[in-house]
Amino acid sequence: MIARSLKHWTGRNLLAGSETGAPAAFAAKIFRAPFVLIAHGTQADPILNYGNAAALALWEMSWEELTRTPSRLTAEAPNREERARLLAAVTANGFIDDYSGIRISKTGRRFRIAQATVWNLLDERGNYSGQAALFSRWEFI
């Protein structure tokens, strides 16, 4: 769903040349990819439901911790209003591909992400199923 939705909104593949073949092999490549990929669901307070190895390392969480975390907690309280505006814009427009902002890890380590693509996730029927973000540029601050 993540790769298909990215292609739907942006016309780009998640991993060029890797989206054919066995789904398990594709999932393993994405999990080990050198970029951060993270997603949340559709709950009133959306819970993270996917993070690849780079996301787990950046947010300093285990899979179990990540998939119990409300996505709003990836930003510090003063930055949550700005984050909410971003997600509302993505909901309205389908995606953005130039997001920059400050995030915070589980241990309180702050980092700035740059040139992130954030997009709506759609199921096979085109129903809204959450949002995902992809970025490969960040710096600790």
Segments (PLM) and residue ranges:
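Terminal domain-start segments
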Residues: 1-27
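Sensory/regulatory domains in signal-transduction proteins
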Residues: 25, 31-141
